[in-house]
């Protein structure tokens, strides 16, 4: 098979990375995508570093065996822990995702920037380095959100449970003083509407999906690996849980407006 005709692999600790996959499919509609969600082992954000590395390499091997031409690690935790190791071990373009702090700063809105993420993402050196770039000039506050990915893995993306979770997390803030909220986990875009409700739509909500998808397109173009023929690509979803419910939820989230 011509390398251009090979699919693009996507990986996340569960269904969250589908938020990034949606953006990539809009940007690259001719491409085929294979998505692997490791919901059996979700969430990654509370696991030990070595376990996250092992799970990430297992998922990557699964997709490599399917013949992918590029890999998107659509998981903030896996990116922060393993992206450098992956690039050293696999000879394909590998794109990661990180909290979109730079776009939030560049809005120049003043006020507080809140970064919602898993405890592990916030504890990793990669995030500390990102914070170091801006902490002297910006009011940035990390907000760990343990338990939120697990709710989304159950298909709970709206309603009282999500509202009350977010209401509790944001109760210590003055909504008028929040300029931006950075979604530092790929699960979180699915609860964006409830987040707007909780914060009275005062803050700009930013995630890294578009930036990651744009980088994927850039790398494929530079490597002459884009599909050229006029066609509509397809998306195939796999999950380590191997039950129909999680696959159905995955496609439901992919098609969610």
From Swiss-Prot:
Pfam families, per database record: Asp_Glu_race
Record-linked InterPro entries: Asp/Glu/hydantoin_racemase, Asp/Glu_race, Asp/Glu_racemase_AS_1, Asp/Glu_racemase_AS_2, Glu_race
Recorded GO MF terms: glutamate racemase activity
First-level EC class: isomerase
Pathway where it operates: Cell wall biogenesis; peptidoglycan biosynthesis
Catalytic activity: L-glutamate = D-glutamate
Keyword terms of this UniProt record: Cell shape, Cell wall biogenesis/degradation, Isomerase, Peptidoglycan synthesis
Residues of the active site: 75 (proton donor/acceptor), 185 (proton donor/acceptor)
Signal peptide: none
Enzyme Commission no: 5.1.1.3
Source organism superkingdom: Bacteria
One GO BP: peptidoglycan biosynthetic process
Amino-acid positions noted as binding substrate in the UniProt annotation, renumbered to this chain: 12-13, 44-45, 76-77, 186-187
SUPFAM superfamilies: Aspartate/glutamate racemase (SSF53681)
Family to which the UniProt record says this protein belongs: Belongs to the aspartate/glutamate racemases family.
Role of this protein: Provides the (R)-glutamate required for cell wall biosynthesis.
UniProt cross-references to NCBIfam families, sorted A to Z: glut_race (TIGR00067)
Name used for this protein in its record: Glutamate racemase
Source lineage: Bacteria, Bacillati, Bacillota, Clostridia, Eubacteriales
Gene: murI
């Amino acid at each position: 098979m011509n390398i251009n005709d090979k699919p693009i692999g996507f990986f996340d600790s569960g269904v969250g990375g589908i938020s990034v996959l949606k953006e990539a499919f809009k940007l690259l509609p001719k491409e085929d995508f294979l998505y692997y969600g490791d919901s059996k082992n979700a969430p990654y954000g509370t696991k030990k570093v070595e376990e996250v590395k092992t799970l990430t390499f297992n998922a990557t091997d699964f997709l490599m065996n399917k013949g992918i031409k590029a890999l998107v690690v659509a998981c903030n935790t896996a990116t922060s822990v393993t992206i450098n190791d992956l690039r050293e071990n696999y000879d394909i373009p590998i794109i990661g995702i990180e909290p979109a702090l730079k776009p939030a700063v560049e809005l120049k809105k003043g006020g507080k920037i809140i970064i919602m993420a898993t405890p592990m993402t916030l504890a990793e050196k990669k995030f500390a380095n990102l914070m170091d770039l801006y902490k002297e000039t910006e009011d940035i506050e990390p907000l760990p959100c343990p338990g939120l990915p697990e709710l989304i893995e159950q298909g709970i993306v709206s309603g009282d449970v999500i509202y009350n979770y977010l209401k509790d997390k944001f109760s210590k803030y003055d909504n008028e003083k929040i300029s931006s909220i950075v979604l530092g986990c790929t699960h979180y875009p699915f609860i964006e509407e409830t987040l707007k409700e909780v914060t009275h739509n005062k803050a700009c909500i930013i995630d890294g999906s578009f930036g990651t998808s744009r980088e994927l397109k850039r790398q494929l173009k530079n490597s002459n690996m884009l599909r050229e023929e006029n066609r509509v690509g397809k998306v195939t979803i796999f999950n380590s849980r191997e039950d129909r419910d999680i696959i159905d939820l995955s496609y439901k989230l992919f098609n969610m407006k």
